[in-house]
Design a protein with these regions (language model features):
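Basic, alpha-helical terminal appendages of large translation-related enzymes
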Residues: 2-16, 56, 60, 132-137, ...
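Conserved, charged catalytic cores of large soluble enzymes
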Residues: 7-29, 43-215, 252-262, 376-416, ...
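Structured secondary-structure scaffolds
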Residues: 14-52, 56-59, 111-115, 160-385, ...
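Short, mixed-charge aromatic SLiMs
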Residues: 144-148, 271, 310-315, 366, ...
Length: 550
């Protein structure tokens, strides 16, 4: 099918929400930056599923390149064995963190190789690829030739480029410069190509170049890659290969029996989640130019969602400094969901943040254990104690404080939805936290434990508990895109899972829990994370108790 035919077909094919992440380089195990990106994308994917959209969430691994080949040689194993070992570590972490990806991209997959080679052949046939000899400086770490633009004020190549060597060799080039004027116009007029919007200037500045892109490496120094279909002495440059994963695993140019999605349902990607370090030139320059050369229109360009970095004491994480945070150790120490919560709560999408395990504990204990967890536990316990676990008639009693709580709950749903649609997860969670605080203030104001002592106040008591349970239910439902396990436990205790099964956030309205609804028994959803000092005090207390009993 031609691209034009696919465009026409797309207008009648139901669209899916297509969200991707950068594919992780398999030269070393995952760190906290990898985990943040995948959790952020997972939260957004779950949010769009909650909205009733059909979602396709793709993540994966980048398995080719010189660094992989060199590391495998040092270890005395094949590159395939090395990437298989590292890939297994990524897969295990994503399972542990509850990453709900629908597709998995690995660049050694034969389907990806076939797509890359078809694209290379098509580009060559269109005159977009040519061969020439070039002499210049080459970054072994970044696996690319450098220009004078990469030099610092002293005229040197900075430490971010690692070892830089002078090379002269023949290679294949992509006519990147053919697309400069188009890219400038496209990026300038586009409001949705790169988000947050402040990243747009960075892309525009990067478009100002006058050299083409080397897209091959001679097999004489790199054999671990996808062979050029028209020149078997060369393999494909790792970035050119890797970027194509966004279309290859979406079914682009795939064979009918490939078991890949239908491309016309997915493309263009609604959200490609990437780190700021790979915005330019890879995703902000190379990728749109490649797509344009392949025949994609302005309307068929993806949206890039660019996130910031987790720093340590203001410094970028680095193996050489020794400050890399292992997400597996975090999940083992605190649990997967506290880690998920922290990674999207303590950072603004698009900005940098400073990683702090003490803040992870503080945010979890304050916002989840003390606030939301305590609210749910108290509300369910009091309903069991005072109302035999049954929700009363909604028309029985009302007052101004209860009316105000209904208004703030509706506002919280609206704000949460707005922020999530804007990919601002931390702000969305802040809106929910504000409502939880309003509920806890409502409890202190109404004092249901005092109302229970006065038989004449029984209608008011039942009204208070009904309002608290409704807020717990709606809050517990919404937080499910961030904390799916905790959400399920809250709704289970409220016996409300079926009541929310066919709902979407835009259909939330007061009164989801019906009159006469019976809830289940409470159980702590967010047990506090204890400090070492608290653990020591508890152990000391337990020892004293045991001594007395002995």
């Amino acid at each position: 099918m031609t691209l034009l035919a696919k465009r026409k077909e797309r207008s009648i094919v139901p669209r899916m929400y297509y969200i991707t992440t950068a594919i992780d380089y398999t030269n070393g195990p995952p760190h906290i930056g990898h985990a943040y990106e995948k959790v952020l994308a997972d939260v957004l994917a779950r949010w769009h599923r909650m909205k009733g959209e059909e979602v396709y969430f793709l993540t994966g691994v980048d398995q080719h390149g010189q660094k992989v080949q060199q590391t495998a040689e040092k270890l005395g194993i094949t590159p395939q064995e090395h990437v298989d070992n590292i890939t297994a570590k990524f897969l295990a972490l994503w399972e542990r963190l509850g990453i709900s990806n629908d597709g998995w991209a690995s660049t050694t997959d034969p389907r990806h190789k076939a797509c890359v080679q078809k694209i290379l052949t098509n580009l060559k046939d269109r005159g977009q690829l040519y061969k020439k000899s070039y002499k210049g400086f080459y970054s072994v770490r970044q696996e690319q030739f450098l220009t004078d633009k990469e030099r610092d004020a002293e005229g040197s190549f900075g430490p971010e480029w690692g070892e830089v060597v002078e090379l002269e060799e023949e290679n294949w080039y992509f006519r990147l410069t053919d697309h400069v004027e188009w890219m400038k116009k496209f990026v300038e007029k586009s409001s949705g190509f790169v988000l947050p919007a402040f990243r747009k200037a960075e892309v525009l500045n990067a478009i100002d170049f006058d050299s083409d892109l080397c897209i091959s490496r001679p097999k004489s120094r790199l054999s671990w890659g996808i062979e050029l279909p028209f020149d078997p002495e060369f393999v494909t440059y790792v970035w050119f290969d890797a970027l194509i994963n966004y279309v290859s695993f979406a079914g682009y140019l795939a064979e009918p029996d490939s078991e890949l999605p239908e491309f016309s349902k997915l493309w263009p990607a609604d959200c490609e989640v990437i780190g700021k370090d790979i915005l330019v030139p890879a995703h902000g320059v190379y990728w749109p130019a490649m797509l344009h050369a392949m025949g994609f229109s302005d309307e068929e360009m993806p949206t890039l969602l660019v996130h910031g970095w987790w720093n340590i004491n203001g410094e970028k994480m680095s193996k050489s400094i020794g400050n890399v945070v292992d997400p597996n150790l975090l999940a083992e120490q605190f649990g997967p969901e506290p880690v998920r919560y922290y990674l999207v709560r303590d950072i603004t999408t698009g900005k940098d943040a400073n990683f702090d395990a003490d803040r992870l504990v503080m945010l979890y204990n304050t916002e989840l254990a003390n606030d939301l967890g305590n609210l749910c536990n108290r509300s369910i316990n009091m309903t069991r104690r005072y109302c035999d676990s049954v929700i009363s008639d909604a028309e029985e009693y009302d007052d101004e404080a209860s009316k105000a709580l209904r208004v703030t709950m509706d506002q919280a749903v609206t704000l949460f939805s707005k922020y999530m649609d804007d990919n601002m997860v931390s702000d969305a969670l802040a809106a929910l936290n504000a409502q939880v605080s309003a509920c806890n203030a409502y409890i202190e104001q109404q004092q249901p434990w005092q109302l229970a002592k006065d038989e004449a106040a029984a209608p008011r008591l039942r009204c208070v508990l009904r309002h608290l349970l409704e807020c717990c239910a709606q809050t517990g439902y919404l937080i499910g895109c961030v904390l799916p396990d905790a959400s399920a436990r809250i709704l289970d205790q409220l016996n409300a899972a079926d009541l929310f099964r066919d709902r979407t956030p835009d259909t939330l309205a007061w009164g989801i829990l019906p009159s006469g609804h019976r809830i289940n028994d409470p159980a702590p959803v967010f047990p506090r994370i204890l400090s070492e000092e608290e653990k020591a005090k508890l152990a000391e207390k337990a020892a004293r108790t045991a001594k007395k009993q002995g």
